[in-house]
């Protein structure tokens, strides 16, 4: 089966007026060595969201010379997102919730700021409220033109901020979030989260301002304002977005599912199914398979590298639900991969 579902049911509307949104932001904890591989170096992680956005929309990057890569040279999962969306031709839009580097393209800005180090406090409370409220207004506006949203994300180290938010909201999440690396740096993540949740404010917005990254607030706001159905396109981070949404409007979860990849489902170092069940939200997973790829840089997805990001799972699910096969997606991904790796040489 090309798409599997867990924790309940969720139907993507037929002939829906659909929009793909990429919400970008940065957090200063991505600068901590060893925490994330979503960039060739810790410093370059602040360029990754802007570069992902540029590649998704334009097929090339200008804020850095190449597409974002891991330290061992594996390119961004945006190549999967772009490949999948080429089959379905739905509009794509970038929303900046608080990225330190801005992409060179038209976008919608939520008036946010880059996230700081969550051990000291991610955002000022008024900034967190502004991101959330502007997201709600944007979601309401999207309701006038669309009835289905796919919301992807790009924020290096976002699984750590997601863990902090989930723990701060009372969920058992310390050993359950994923990583872009096959070696999930769990002990480092836990150390950061333990420090972050000390002296936590008692009110909800106070907690979110301390722990959340701007992306989670932007995604949650858009979802809260939107009237139709939503696929939160991402891995364990999106369980944190769903948990935030639930805090403000529990009934909204009936219109929402997480859309991810089989690589996140199969990740033994995390538990997205358990997290989603605790929050009360279904998961759809694109059962992509790159085993037979002619490129080693794509085969390594089957070994636990990268796994998800930039809405790769959600975009693939949307394409597969419209009859696109794994082989077609892989063929298009290989075409893009060949082009970008030729440029990398």
Curated annotation (Swiss-Prot):
Q: Cite the HAMAP family for this sequence.
A: UPF0284
Q: Which family does it belong to?
A: Belongs to the UPF0284 family.
Q: Which residues, if any, are the signal sequence? A: none
For this chain, one GO molecular function annotation is:
nicotinate-nucleotide-dimethylbenzimidazole phosphoribosyltransferase activity
Q: Which Gene3D superfamilies match?
A: 3.40.50.10210
Instruction: Identify the CDD domains for this entry.
Output: DMB-PRT_CobT (cd02439)
**Organism name:** Sulfurisphaera tokodaii (strain DSM 16993 / JCM 10545 / NBRC 100140 / 7) (Sulfolobus tokodaii)
Specify the protein name: UPF0284 protein STK_21430
User: Which domain of life does this protein belong to?
Assistant: Archaea
């Amino acid at each position: 089966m090309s798409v599997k579902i867990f924790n309940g049911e969720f139907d993507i509307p037929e002939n829906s007026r659909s929009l793909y949104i990429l919400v970008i932001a940065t957090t200063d904890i991505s600068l901590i060595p060893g925490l994330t591989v979503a960039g060739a170096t810790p410093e370059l992680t602040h360029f990754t969201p802007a570069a992902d956005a540029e590649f998704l929309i334009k097929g090339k990057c200008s804020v850095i010379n190449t597409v974002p890569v891991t330290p061992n040279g594996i390119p961004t999962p945006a190549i999967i997102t772009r490949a999948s969306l080429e089959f379905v031709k739905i509009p794509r839009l970038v929303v900046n919730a608080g990225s330190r580097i801005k992409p060179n393209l038209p976008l919608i800005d939520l008036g946010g700021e880059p996230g700081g180090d969550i051990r000291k406090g991610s955002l000022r409370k008024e900034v967190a409220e502004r991101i959330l409220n502007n997201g709600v207004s944007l979601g309401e506006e999207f309701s006038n033109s669309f009835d289905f949203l796919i919301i992807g994300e790009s924020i290096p180290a976002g699984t750590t901020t997601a863990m902090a938010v989930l723990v701060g909201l009372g969920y058992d999440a310390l050993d359950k979030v994923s990583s872009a690396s096959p070696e999930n740096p769990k002990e480092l993540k836990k150390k950061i989260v333990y420090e972050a949740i000390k002296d936590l404010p008692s009110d909800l917005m106070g907690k979110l301002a301390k722990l959340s990254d701007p992306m989670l607030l932007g995604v949650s706001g858009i979802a809260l304002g939107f009237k139709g159905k939503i696929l939160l396109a991402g891995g364990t981070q999106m369980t944190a977005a769903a948990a935030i949404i639930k805090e403000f409007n529990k009934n909204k979860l009936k219109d929402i599912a997480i859309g991810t990849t089989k690589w996140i489902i199969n990740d033994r170092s995390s538990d997205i199914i358990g997290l989603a069940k605790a929050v009360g939200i279904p998961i759809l997973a694109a059962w992509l398979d790159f085993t037979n790829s002619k490129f080693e840089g794509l085969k390594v997805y089957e070994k636990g590298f990268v796994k998800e990001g930039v809405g790769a799972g959600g975009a693939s699910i949307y394409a597969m639900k419209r009859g696109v096969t794994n082989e077609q997606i892989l063929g298009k991904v290989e075409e893009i991969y060949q082009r970008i790796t030729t440029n990398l040489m």
